[in-house]
Amino acid sequence: MCGIVGAVAQRDVAEILINGLHRLEYRGYDSAGVAVINKQNELQRIRCLGKVKALDEAVSEKPLIGGTGIAHTRWATHGEPSETNAHPHSSGTFAVVHNGIIENHEELRELLKSRGYVFLSQTDTEVIAHLVEWEMRTTDSLLDAVKKAVKQLTGAYGMVVMDSRHPEHLVAARSGSPLVIGLGIGENFLASDQLALLSVTRRFIFLEEGDIAEITRRTVDIYDTHGNKAKREIHESNLENDAAEKGKFRHFMQKEIYEQPTALINTMEGRINHENVIVDSIGNGAKGILEKVEHIQIVACGTSYNAGMVARYWFESLAGVSCDVEIASEFRYRKFVTRPNSLLITLSQSGETADTLAALRLAKEKGYMAALTICNVAGSSLVRESDLAFMTRAGVEVGVASTKAFTTQLAALLMLVTALGKVKGHISVEKEREIIKAMQSLPAEIEKALAFDTEIEALAEDFAEKHHALFLGRGAFYPIAVEASLKLKEISYIHAEAYAAGELKHGPLALIDADMPVIVVAPNNELLEKVKSNIEEVRARGGQLYVFADKEAGFTPSEGMKIITMPKVNDIVAPIFYTIPMQLLSYYVALIKGTDVDQPRNLAKSVTVE
């Protein structure tokens, strides 16, 4: 969600800070700000409502000169989007930027008011600034003041604090919201995402839960939740500096849709050969864990949850292991029964999704045999805190609407299903070879699906004046319909819903009329005849049908029904394949609607607070 960048250097850092914010724009925000300690040890601050570009222009008009600074993009939680509520917030010589939610901010606000502090904003973050200023009255150490302040906070935070009286120091604290340190030569950096710092370093330390860090130009000191000095592993990033550039594409989402063949190759590389899935590639000790598994519990949010729903069909039909899938924000707040020898699987693009991370921590207390995460970001909290980590290697995904993260999660899940089925003796050698062959053909098949972009773009014109849409699917294509409806509503703002096609008679049929487009995913499989019956129900009521099917399904266009004839692919990987035309449809409808494709309103890429 919000973005943080900090720097301590010999050189002026304002440009580094603002460039970092530009790289974090994909996370979603409504205002931005930057503060620098100048050469006279004075705090200078500029904030603005709107885009980072406006902040950049303001700094160009009134340059900020200094080697220590912090910057922030805000996504409003407490207080409306405004310049006054934008970060950094200050108190005397202090400035602070903060991601997260301070749950006891009202209580602390009243306490600080009683001590004479005047609040200028509606935010919970201003409480932190005043609290640190108060604690600094009894110490000359910024680190100690921050330590005392955070002990009084309840909630989630990733924060960076600076004090103009200590001009070469930044102090950061992490509890429930990610922070990463970037290591330079004679300079060091902080950010909420390593992507912000790729132009200045490739060496990173990911702060762990409860860590507090003090950085100067030449030193980095980290203290754990008990106050003891801690050593944290240094990670060398292999992300490209231009990973957050659109290149020849109009939008990041479009770029990421077209990157999927390569992303899938990267996901599979070194994990499958011509005949089988390499079980050990899932992680050290994976085979021993899989041999004992009797149940799978998948926990995820949003698009990742939809990937888990597809995987449930695979786990049960291919591997013969029962599987439950639950939304993380529901899972963590209900009383549940842990099944014997149950493997917990978390899915998250960022590895920092707040509810999923909290669900993992809860599950550790509930007797799950092990926790495996399928994730795209190395060094993230889910990766560090899970027993096994299966990295999707999708590369940086900037568009808020997830595309390649979804398909690579599905590929990773299918490899896991195959490995589990093989270990459990439920998948034969011949079946494994069939799955491997189908997976290896996927990148080329997806290239064929991408070739339908012109046809789908023309189809999208039909949605120009539409305000509602209905998606239908059966079996493993029901969650693909759910994912398609999510994409359409996210980026085009069309109210879209998805149903298992067999549920039409149980309510949704009442919505069907000539103004309701109905998109059906209907490849030729064992459920096709059932889907055809559902299609006839829609036709009989004048609904406008858009059917995505292969030639073998036998559909012919007619009045009120358009057919998009896709190539035939293996049934096992067909859910991944049919995701592509759904993504293209959503993208082109959003273009026609004129919405902000990469940064849709009210949404953020990484949901790092509840």
UniProtKB/Swiss-Prot annotation:
Keyword Cytoplasm: yes
Disulfide bonds: none
Broad class of the protein's primary localization: cytoplasm
GO MF, one example: glutamine-fructose-6-phosphate transaminase (isomerizing) activity
Catalytic activity: D-fructose 6-phosphate + L-glutamine = D-glucosamine 6-phosphate + L-glutamate
GO biological process: one example: carbohydrate metabolic process
E.C. code: 2.6.1.16
Source organism, top-level taxon: Bacteria
Protein name per the record: Glutamine--fructose-6-phosphate aminotransferase [isomerizing]
